[in-house]
């Protein structure tokens, strides 16, 4: 058992311990950066030095370190996170690994993301739910292409707090000039990113624990806080609660004739009993009657809470609709301008129809044009006709029906969407809405069914010698 937890339970009792634990805020953060920068070792060190490893786990790490470890006589703490056999054999991270730990001030969920370029889509998946990005830089190598790539993706996915951990300082003798040089280079690059990002830098050694949980005597010139202290002090809850109210409906709960509730998780903002709201896309108004949870009714609820809302009026609301404040002006549009991260081996095809899923809403749409692709090593843009695997581009998306969306930077849940291949049902891309465009003439699919359009696309792909016309371009 974990001796620290055992001691705390003995001191205050199990009920008091659980109650104290329940009321801590939860922070989700990811570690990212170039390959072999020490991401998994850093997470292992955080867990070890904050006393979050059980005795049997620690014993197993010592045993495994003798077989596949890379740290000599010291325990290889990266093995706490690198669970796949292929990861341990190669000494790299492939999948996104999640770990949980807590301190006296806060609970944490860590996403350890891969550094290799071919796993960039895995990194984007891990970043999509995080509040903070811990970006590791090897003090010997400095800022690399993958460092810039991950910083850009984290910025694109709406993360507003960066902690740049300059790792392996022990290998450069904890040299202040080396730290300063890397800091200046990174901050110069970061000027091209979102201007709302808060960036803090910390020198550390994940292998030996310097400046990870507590400040190190090796860096008397560093006047900031340790990594753990920085994570504990990040103020992100207030940002979520101060946003406009957004409630995507996931399920209509009607257990009997006397109850009709709308279940889901609040994407952003606050809601109180008595608030005037409207349902989108219908635009019909009503008033919040009850906020129902498993533990009883609440007078108010905030971002991240799973609740069921009941209204005073019987209005038509279905799964995929969004409930917002009555005075919020949320655009309804068929046309979106969005940044798309492509995650499939086959490139994105302009004009091809895909399933588009926004929050709980599923519809059909296509990319009608790619304005540019981003070279994420230097953030330069260039024109292209398609997006390859791991490519990121600014695209014009046309949907078959008007939906309510926000800019992704304002609301992740109602501004983000996934793209699904209609034939294989595989998620092939992720999109972040920049803005809803003024509706152009909406493509009508009345002349051809979705099956006919997909069948036509297959014929043109596999039997090009038939010279079949693209019927999607004939629709008017």
Swiss-Prot record:
Keyword Iron in annotation: no
Binding site for GTP: 33-40, 112-116, 167-170
Transmembrane segments: none
Keywords, ordered alphabetically: ATP-binding, GTP-binding, Nucleotide-binding, Nucleotidyltransferase, Transferase
EC top class, as a word: transferase
Region (G3) location: 112-115
Annotated tr-type G domain residues: 24-241
MF GO annotations: ATP binding; GTP binding; GTPase activity; guanosine tetraphosphate binding; sulfate adenylyltransferase (ATP) activity
Renumbered residue ranges of the record's region G2: 91-95
InterPro entries: CysN_GTP-bd, CysN_II, CysN_NoDQ_III, EFTu-like_2, G_TR_CS, GTP-eEF1A_C, P-loop_NTPase, Small_GTP-bd
Region (G5): 205-207
Region (G4): 167-170
Reactions mediated catalytically: sulfate + ATP + H(+) = adenosine 5'-phosphosulfate + diphosphate
Region feature (G1): 33-40
Entries under HAMAP family matching the protein: Sulf_adenylyltr_sub1 (MF_00062)
Family: Belongs to the TRAFAC class translation factor GTPase superfamily. Classic translation factor GTPase family. CysN/NodQ subfamily.
Function: With CysD forms the ATP sulfurylase (ATPS) that catalyzes the adenylation of sulfate producing adenosine 5'-phosphosulfate (APS) and diphosphate, the first enzymatic step in sulfur assimilation pathway. APS synthesis involves the formation of a high-energy phosphoric-sulfuric acid anhydride bond driven by GTP hydrolysis by CysN coupled to ATP hydrolysis by CysD.
PANTHER family reported for this sequence: TRANSLATION FACTOR (PTHR23115)
Quaternary data: Heterodimer composed of CysD, the smaller subunit, and CysN.
Entry protein name: Sulfate adenylyltransferase subunit 1
Native organism: Photobacterium profundum (strain SS9)
Source species taxonomy: Bacteria, Pseudomonadati, Pseudomonadota, Gammaproteobacteria, Vibrionales
């Amino acid at each position: 058992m974990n001796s620290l937890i055992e001691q705390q339970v003995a001191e205050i009792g199990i009920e008091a311990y659980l109650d104290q634990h329940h009321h801590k805020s939860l922070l989700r953060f990811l570690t990212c950066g170039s390959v072999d920068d020490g991401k998994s070792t850093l997470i292992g060190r955080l867990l070890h030095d904050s006393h979050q490893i059980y005795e049997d786990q620690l014993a197993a790490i010592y045993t495994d370190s003798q077989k596949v470890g890379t740290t000599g006589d010291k325990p290889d703490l990266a093995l706490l996170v690198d669970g796949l056999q292929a990861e341990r054999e190669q000494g790299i991270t492939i999948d996104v690994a999640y770990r949980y730990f807590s301190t006296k001030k806060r609970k944490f969920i860590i996403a350890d993301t891969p550094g290799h370029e071919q796993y960039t889509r895995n990194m984007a998946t891990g970043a999509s739910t995080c509040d903070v990005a811990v970006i590791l830089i090897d003090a010997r190598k400095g800022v690399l292409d993958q460092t810039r790539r991950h910083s850009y993706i984290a910025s694109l996915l709406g993360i507003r707090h960066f902690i740049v951990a300059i790792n392996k300082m022990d290998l450069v003798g904890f040299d202040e000039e080396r730290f300063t040089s890397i800091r200046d280079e990174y901050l110069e690059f970061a000027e091209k990113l979102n201007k709302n990002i808060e960036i803090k830098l910390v020198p550390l050694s994940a292998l030996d624990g310097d400046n990870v949980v507590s400040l190190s005597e090796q860096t008397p010139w560093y006047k900031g806080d340790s990594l753990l202290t920085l994570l504990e002090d990040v103020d992100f809850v207030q940002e979520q609660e101060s946003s406009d109210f957004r409630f995507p409906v996931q399920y209509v709960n009607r257990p009997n004739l006397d109850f009709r509730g709308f279940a889901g998780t609040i994407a952003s903002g606050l809601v109180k009993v008595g608030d005037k709201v409207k349902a989108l896309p219908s635009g019909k108004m009503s008033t919040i009657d009850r906020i129902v949870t498993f533990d009883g009714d609440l007078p108010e609820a905030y971002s991240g809470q799973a609740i069921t809302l009941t209204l005073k009026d019987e209005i038509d609301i279905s799964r995929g609709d969004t409930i917002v404040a009555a005075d919020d002006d949320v655009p309804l549009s068929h046309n979106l301008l969005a940044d798309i991260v492509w995650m499939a081996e086959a490139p994105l095809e302009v004009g091809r129809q895909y399933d588009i899923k926004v929050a709980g809403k599923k519809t059909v749409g296509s990319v009608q044009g790619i304005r540019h692709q981003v070279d994420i090593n230097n953030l330069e843009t260039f024109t292209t006709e398609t997006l390859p695997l791991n490519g990121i581009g600014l695209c014009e998306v046309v949907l078959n029906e008007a939906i309510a969306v926000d800019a992704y930077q304002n609301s992740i849940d109602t501004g983000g969407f996934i793209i699904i291949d209609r034939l294989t049902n595989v998620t092939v891309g992720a999109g972040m809405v920049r803005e809803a465009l003024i509706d152009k003439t909406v493509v009508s699919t009345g002349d051809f069914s979705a099956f006919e359009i997909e069948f036509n696309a297959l014929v043109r792909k596999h039997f090009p010698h038939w010279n079949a016309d693209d019927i999607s371009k004939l629709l008017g």
